[in-house]
């Protein structure tokens, strides 16, 4: 077999475009069950893997995994409409970050938390923020959860984990809000593709790419247009 053949790389084979529907089905099932999904962005972008959990289905075990295995910067991905209802303003007036990541001010639940740092407290904060009746009185700033605002077009507008999180939650039939944290290695470096696949296999988690989500949405749009 030629050494340049993608099939010679078992990890590359995991991302066969023909298997995208199966990867998406596994990821959406996991979102509905509150199981983390390992999502990779493009190799020429951040080239990082995030663990993503539907905000509606967040559990103590899921949050503990985010804190233990990831960077510790737990982010809540929201639509612009939800962020506005919560009264969340941008973290800075002029966003100069490399990828335009739309951080708002950090938040804490107004009631029900102590220091806000524990897994239980961060879950309380996220539940307060995504509750159907949540408003600007539900949370305070600063805090230990970092909201991110997704662009309206999702991954078709911006190929970021923020948009991927909201798209996955919406595609799973849940509220359009996701919780994410960047996967890290024990030595403090960021997990890349092969590291992320090994982690997913060790923990029995589905793995997919932002490209998978974009292709899935494009296929859905074509199916609707031809219906």
Swiss-Prot record:
Q: Which cofactor does it need?
A: Mg(2+); Mn(2+)
Q: Which GO terms describe its molecular function?
A: 3,4-dihydroxy-2-butanone-4-phosphate synthase activity; magnesium ion binding; manganese ion binding
Coiled coil ranges (UniProt) are none
Under which EC number(s) is this enzyme classified? 4.1.99.12
Pathway where this protein functions: Cofactor biosynthesis; riboflavin biosynthesis; 2-hydroxy-3-oxobutyl phosphate from D-ribulose 5-phosphate: step 1/1
What cellular component GO annotations does this protein have?
A: cytosol
Give the note describing cofactor binding and stoichiometry: Binds 2 divalent metal cations per subunit. Magnesium or manganese.
User: What positions does the entry give for Mg(2+) 2 binding?
Assistant: 46, 161
Task: Tell me if Metal-binding is a UniProt keyword of this record.
Answer: yes
UniProt binding sites for Mg(2+) 1: 46
Q: Which Pfam families match?
A: DHBP_synthase (PF00926)
Q: Which reaction(s) are listed as its catalytic activity?
A: D-ribulose 5-phosphate = (2S)-2-hydroxy-3-oxobutyl phosphate + formate + H(+)
- Residue numbers for the site described as Essential for catalytic activity? 144, 182
GO biological-process terms attached to the record = riboflavin biosynthetic process
Enzyme class, top EC level, equals: lyase
Which family is this sequence assigned to?
Answer: Belongs to the DHBP synthase family.
List, alphabetically, the HAMAP family matched.
Answer: RibB (MF_00180)
Recorded hits in NCBIfam families, A to Z, give: ribB (TIGR00506)
| Function text | Catalyzes the conversion of D-ribulose 5-phosphate to formate and 3,4-dihydroxy-2-butanone 4-phosphate.
Q: What is this protein called?
A: 3,4-dihydroxy-2-butanone 4-phosphate synthase
Which species?
Answer: Ralstonia nicotianae (strain ATCC BAA-1114 / GMI1000) (Ralstonia solanacearum)
Q: Which gene encodes it?
A: ribB
């Amino acid at each position: 077999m030629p050494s340049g053949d993608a099939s010679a790389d078992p990890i590359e084979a995991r991302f066969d475009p023909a298997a995208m529907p199966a990867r998406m089905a596994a990821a959406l099932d996991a979102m509905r069950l509150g199981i983390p999904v390992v999502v990779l962005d493009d190799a020429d972008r951040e080239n990082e893997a995030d663990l993503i959990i539907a905000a509606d289905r967040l559990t103590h075990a899921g949050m503990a995994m985010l804190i233990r295995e990831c960077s510790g910067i737990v982010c809540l991905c929201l639509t612009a409409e939800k962020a506005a209802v919560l009264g969340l303003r941008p973290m800075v007036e002029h966003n100069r970050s490399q990828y335009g990541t739309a951080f708002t001010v950090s938040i804490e639940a107004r009631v029900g938390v102590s220091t806000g740092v524990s897994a239980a407290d961060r879950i309380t904060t996220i539940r307060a923020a995504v509750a159907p009746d949540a408003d600007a009185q539900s949370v305070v700033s600063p805090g230990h959860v970092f909201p991110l605002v997704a662009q309206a077009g999702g991954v078709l507008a911006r190929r970021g984990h923020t948009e991927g999180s909201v798209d996955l939650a919406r595609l799973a039939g849940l509220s359009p809000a996701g919780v994410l944290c960047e996967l890290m290695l024990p030595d403090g470096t960021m997990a890349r593709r092969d590291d992320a696949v090994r982690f997913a296999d060790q923990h029995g988690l589905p793995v997919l790419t932002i490209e998978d989500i974009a292709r899935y949405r494009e296929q859905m749009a074509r199916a609707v247009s031809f219906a």
